[in-house]
Every structure is written in structure tokens, then in C-alpha cells.
Amino acid sequence: MILQKRTADQILIIFILVVLLVILGCISVLTGSADIGIKELYALFNGSVDEFARNILLTIRLPRILAAVIMGGALAVSGFLLQVFFGNPIAGPYVLGVSSSAKLFVALVMVFLLKSGRVFSSFGMIAAAFLGSLLSMGIVLILAGKVRSMSLLVVCGVMIGYICSAITDFVVCFAEDSNIVNLHNWSLGSFSGTTMEYVQISFGIVFACLFLSFMLSKPIGAYQLGEAYARNMGVNIKALRVILILASSLLSATVTAFAGPISFVGIAVPHIMRGILKTAKPLIMIPACFLGGAIITLICDDIARTAFAPTELSISSVTAVGLAPVVILLLLRRGERRSE
């Protein structure tokens, strides 16, 4: 009876998150430096909206909002999968250097192609980011076999991130003057300039990864209880690990390719959702993390583009200020539990 009530409460919370996301999405459509209100939004639906408002809503705001929702959710799920894989509550795509490595590879491809006068495709950027993510994950996995302390492993991941960021800054210096501003803005993290093409591509990739992760909820749940238990339940540990690495890396790579590195969403959101839902079950956590990541990223993006309008902040700066305290609190609580 208690279990049924808890499950019902969790489903209710997920429903509330969906409603909250829809409300925030509507608010975001009406939020910006251009004075567009409910009247213009209504006119858009009945076809009587003027060209200026139409372009602002459909070309700028809607793609940006959808990108924030899709990519914020992707980062949160990526963080959850990495935390399951490493059994470490402070693992995440940004902390382990996955995002920074993906950023480096995309920067290399962008600078090389721009210098040679070639046009790079969306899939090319994703492929470059994915290779960068896999490289970082490979290094972390090698270190995991040699380093027993998970805290030390995370420190190594942070160092990998710093090295990749430093090399990226070095690479950007060799870009053409006309492209430096775009490269710099992208490297800081931003949804500015997102198009519906980017949204469609990212949605397809993210949806595929989410669907795969959700279908593997039971094996992932068994893996959370220990490798021995998972093996007894018939889980192919090696195959599951490969899937976790590929899915988390591809989710992180997709975000980095289109929006640049976005910090702390992947590490903080899974913990926030665990605290709210009082569970770590993947069947509940995967959709909850996606919704939580989407909501938080959407709020942070609204702050980034309106707080000092017309000047726009990088999304990563806002997420760092808002979510870094959550990570610090987590580390402090973890230290207190160990000392007891």
C-alpha cells in the first residue's frame, strides 16, 4: 500500500513537472527584448500576425526554447547515466571533462573547415563532438582502472577538462578574425542563433538515446544494486556499460556541438530529482531528469538573455552560479556521512 502511494506520488510529480515545463515555455515565448505579448501570440495562431512578430516568434524564440528544453534534458539524463556507470554521485559530463573534450574537437573541425573555405554540416559537428566525448571517456576509464578513489577520478576528469579548454582557447586564436566572435560565443555556451534544423537533428538523436535508456531501465536498475546482483539477474554487464558510455557521450556531444559546453546541469539535476522523488529507479529518474533538466535550463536561458538585455550572458555562466552551490552542498553532505 505504501509502495503504491509512493509510486502514485512520483507519477503526480512527473505530471506537475510536465505542466510546469509547458507554462515556462509559454512565458519564455513572451519574454525578450522585443515587445511581443499574448496579443501577438494569438495573432500568430489565427494568421493575422505581422511579419516582424512572426519572425521573432518562429525564427528566434521558438527554436531557442525548444533547444533549451531538448538539450537541458539531454544533459541531465547524460549526467544520470554517468553517475550510474561510475557509481559516483558527483560524476557528470562537465565534471569528467566530456563536454570540454567534445568542445575541443568541434573547435578543431570548425577552425580547420572555416580556414579551408568549406562548409561544415550539423552531423559533422556532432560526429566531432562525439569523438571528443569518447576520447575523454576512454581516458577516464583507463584512469578508473588505476585509481581506486572516485574523488580522485573526478579530480582527474576536471584536469582533463581544463587541458581541453586551454587547447580550445589556443585553437580559437588561429581562427579568422570574422569567425572569432562566433567561435568565442559558442565556446562559452549559448542557445543564441539556434535554428529549427538544429532542433530537429538534436531532437532525433536525443529521443533515440532517451528511448534506448528508458527501455533498459530494468538492467540499469539491477546494475545500480551491484554487478553481482545484475549478473544474477541475467544482465550482460559489458554490453550495458558500452551502451551507458555511448548514450551518455552522444547526449553530451549533441549539446556541445550545437550550444557549446553547459556546466553543472548534468551533475546537479539528477540529485535534485532524487531528493524530490525519493527514488533512484531509472524508470522514474530518466523522464524526471529530462524534465528537470529542461525546466532548469529554460529558466537559466531566460535569465541569460533578459537579465542584462540587450547584452546576453552565456548560459554556462548562469547555470554555474545557480547550480554550483547544489554541488558544493552535495559534497559537504557526502563528507558528513563519511565522518559519521
Regions found by a protein language model. Give the residues of each.
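Alpha-helical transmembrane segments in inner-membrane proteins
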Residues: 1-340
